[in-house]
Amino acid sequence: MIIVHHLNNSRSQRILWVLEELEIPYEIKFYQRGADHRAPKELRDVHPLGKSPVITDTDRGNKVVAESGAIINYLIKYYGNGRGVPTKEREDDNDFWTQFSEASLMPNLVLLLIFMLLPTQVPFFIRPILNMVGNQVRRLLICLLYTSPS
């Protein structure tokens, strides 16, 4: 059985999606971010990074796998039954989109999230300035998300 250590507002949603697509049975252990938007200490008990996504595979000796790309590869390798493996002709496309999602797309999404949360974390009298700057940055990031890769 795969146990997904699911942290709200994390990349673990993509793991749930892959599990559903591959029809792999799983359980979810839910974790909530604290008021500081950080993962709880309990996630460090599962894996030293203390972040999500992380899975535990109870069918393979309680193997713990962290990082979304590694988890997806693991699930395809051990549970995909040939599904999720690109054909020889599509391997290059698969490599590109995998690298793009991690190296180009995710940094912009993380910055977008930071600029959405930042105004809520500062004193009220600074919020209007941060909102003004943040709105410009958000517009730029959204534009980049729509036009990349180009």
PLM segments and residue spans:
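Conserved small/polar residues in nucleotide/adenosyl-binding loops
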Residues: 146-150
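Internal catalytic-core helix/loop-beta-alpha segment
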Residues: 127-142
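GST-like domain detector, emphasizing the conserved glutathione-binding G-site
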Residues: 1-128
